[in-house]
Amino acid sequence: MHTTAQPSGSEKAQRPSAASIPLLILKTMRPKQWTKNVLLFAGLLFALKFTDVDAILKALAAFGLFCLFSSCVYLINDIRDRDKDSLNPRTAKRPIASGALAWQIAAGAVAVILPITFVLSFLLNPWFALVGAVYMAKDFGYSFGLKHVVILDVFLLASGFTLRAIAGALAIDVPISEWLYVVTTLGALFLALNKRKHEILLLGEGASGHRKVLDEYSPALIEEMLAVITASTVMSYSLYTFTATNLPRPLQENKLMMLTIPFVLYGIFRYLYLVYQKNEGSSPEEVLLRDRPLLICSVLWAVTSATLLYIFSPISGINWGP
């Protein structure tokens, strides 16, 4: 008597319904990571364009396009790493690695999404499109081997945040402030080093099995680098609040932008607490969304900054002259 073989779970996963394919593609695009792209709105805030409807629409378009740029990187990396990911318990459940989403379908999605994203980016601003291309090239360089180069790996992680800030300024056609560049880069290095610190604390002697470059980072080295970057981040932001020439004239005179410094200090200290005491820090965007005190602090900083910039800017219509 013959029995009919039942398809295995993995075989079933390889034949998703047509309705589930868009959801699987979306999952592979990592929408949780899109929160990083909020940094594209920094130029809108600090260039005093947050009441300009045209600038707001351009910033929203830039946000959406950068989400697509980063998502295409995730799709391509998951296609390339599908065999390796299928053997790793941490990544085996990803749609492509598990077989739930055929890699050919994912490749087709990239073939459609990426050209459209570049065309729309070019129409928004050619320089914005160039930054998008540089961002993708940076991510591919990281994925294809540069992530194994000590120190450079951290700079590449951090550069993604700097490129986002630059792209946001280009999208709304405002000058790129030297303070935006310096503070963003130092803050991004702070997050990147804490990511490495978290991995070393969490994995201990097995850290190199997770990421080979971790063999090159001793706890003492990470501590020294973090000390330098943390102090530099606080100092650079503090200097910005009372020396930046792109602040509205009244704020340059009354120095009230310094009221935002405590929020930055608390945010940095809270993040260090979460890394050292709670073993978090592997994903900055998830930490921000999950930790209520840090989220509240970020919102208060943004609201306070926007309020001060608006009240003391010409767009408020308030005359602060003698």
Predicted regions and their residues:
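Short, amphipathic, aromatic/basic-enriched membrane-interface segments that mark the entry/exit
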Residues: 25-32, 94-106, 123-126, 146-154, ...
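Alpha-helical transmembrane segments of multipass membrane proteins
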Residues: 41, 45, 115-119, 137-141, ...
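Long, highly hydrophobic alpha-helical transmembrane signal-anchor segments
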Residues: 36-57, 146-178
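Topogenic membrane-insertion module of multi-pass membrane proteins
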Residues: 1-86, 99-112
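Central hydrophobic cores of alpha-helical transmembrane segments in multi-pass inner-membrane proteins
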Residues: 66-75, 114, 135-140, 269-270
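Multi-pass membrane catalytic core of lipid/isoprenoid biosynthesis enzymes
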Residues: 82, 87-132, 178-189, 223-234, ...
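Acidic (Asp/Glu-rich) catalytic motifs at the cytosolic membrane interface
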Residues: 69-97, 146, 152, 193-201, ...
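C-terminal membrane-associated helical module and adjoining short loops/tails
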Residues: 2-26, 144, 162-322
